[in-house]
Amino acid sequence: SPTQPFPTKPPPFEYQGVSIDDLVDFTPEIRAMAVEAVKDFRLGPLFSPPMLSVDGGLQGTIQRPYVGGGASWTGAAVDPETGLLYVPSMNRFSVLKYYTPDPADGGNLRYTMRGLAAGTQPRMPQGLPLLKPPYTRITAIDLNEGEHAWMQPNGDGNRYRNHPLLRDLDLPPLGGEGHGGPVLTKTLLISALSAGGTDDGPRLVARDKATSVHDAGWSGILYYLFTPLVLRIYDSELVLFVLIRPNFQRNQRSGPRFAQQK
């Protein structure tokens, strides 16, 4: 192929590439901060290559989705009866660059890659986001038609909404934080936010899987960070139990937690 193949169906479930129009614009002042933050980086569409980082020049290519992907390794959920695939995803970026190594370090490579997980990054003041929201979302993809059935932010994103520069703004749901894969019941799509240490997580969230409408009766606070939802069980009284596999961290109480709903 003369070019990198670009899929045409289904549409992307997450942002691809970064342009100046993708920078956050909650207020003119915050927009100016974002423009300043990326002045030493190359912006471009999906598949923009890494670049040589030199002193006094550009410091790398901003890539989106980031190297961990738009979707997470915990995967999606599929309904074989309706043909809908439910994909949670994250709106994040990485900086890709390479540099000329110091000959004194040994080796015979002309260039060395860096910036995959760390290195120079565009930094916003006071922990503000660099890009426009949502920062996490869930997309229902109709596999029969190759189209989106619905797409919704996953959570309100209070970590940003409660920021001193943002708390007085009338912002839409921004999306929380979460790497967990969803599970399905006959009517519900259950997912979770693993935003430990933030104002709106961790939380268990349920939606009507056909319409994306949030089921407030199923939302609840979780005590631990976790990766995926790993099991669902129905008992004789039709009580739904969801077992959470926690990721324990220092200073957290031990033991699993269970969510249930009649």
What does each of the following model-derived ranges do?
Residues 1-232, 236:
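Beta-sheet-rich non-transmembrane sensory/scaffold domains
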Residues 233-248:
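Short, strongly patterned local motifs
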Residues 256-261:
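Short, intrinsically disordered C-terminal tails of secreted or membrane-associated proteins
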